[in-house]
Amino acid sequence: VLATNGYLYEIKEAQTFVTNLSTTMALDKLAESKGSMVIRSAVGEINVVRKMNETNSDLGGEGNGGVILREAHLGRDSLVAATMILNCMSQTDKSLGEIYKTLPKFKFIKDKVDVKGMNLDLLNKKVTNLFKDAEKNTLDGIKFTWEDRWIHLRKSNTEPIMRIYAEAKKYKDALNLITQIKKIL
C-alpha cells in the first residue's frame, strides 16, 4: 500500500492495479481515493502478472510486499517497493510514519484448518448461505466481501489445509468472520 501510494504520488493520474484476492482492501480504498481501481487475480505471482498483461496494468503485487512494476520487470521486487516509498518520502518531504498515518488501515488475520475428511462442496454451500449478504468471488477458493471487511477461504496447493484470511476495520470483526466459519466446520 505504501509503494502504491508512492507510485500514485509520482504518476498523478488514474491507474489500474492488480493484486491477489488475499491482499488488503486498504489498497482498494487508497485507489478509490485517487480515482484509480484495483483488479484482483488468483493468489500467486504468475497469476498477478498474467492479469497485469490482460489489463495492461503497469503496477501489481501481492500482500507480502512484493511489488511488480512493468517498467522494471514482471516479477516481484522488494527493492522496487522500497524505491517507490523512498521516492514518495523525498517528493513530499514527509517521514514514513507521516505517510503511513494518511493511509487506510485494516486488521488482517490468517488462520488455517485441516481439510482431511472435510466435504469442501458442503462447506462451500454452508458458507455461501451464511454470508448471503456479501459479494461472492470464486476465482481462487471462495471470498466474501462487504464494504468494510472480507473473508477468503482457499485450499492450499502444498498442504492438506484450507487457509482462511479475514480483514476488517476492527480486529474483533475480522476474528468474528473466522469464528463463524469455524462454527460450521
Label the predicted regions:
Residues E10-L185:
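Phosphate-binding and adjacent anionic-ligand microenvironments
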Residues V1-Y7:
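Cysteine protease catalytic core and zymogen-processing segment of caspase-like enzymes
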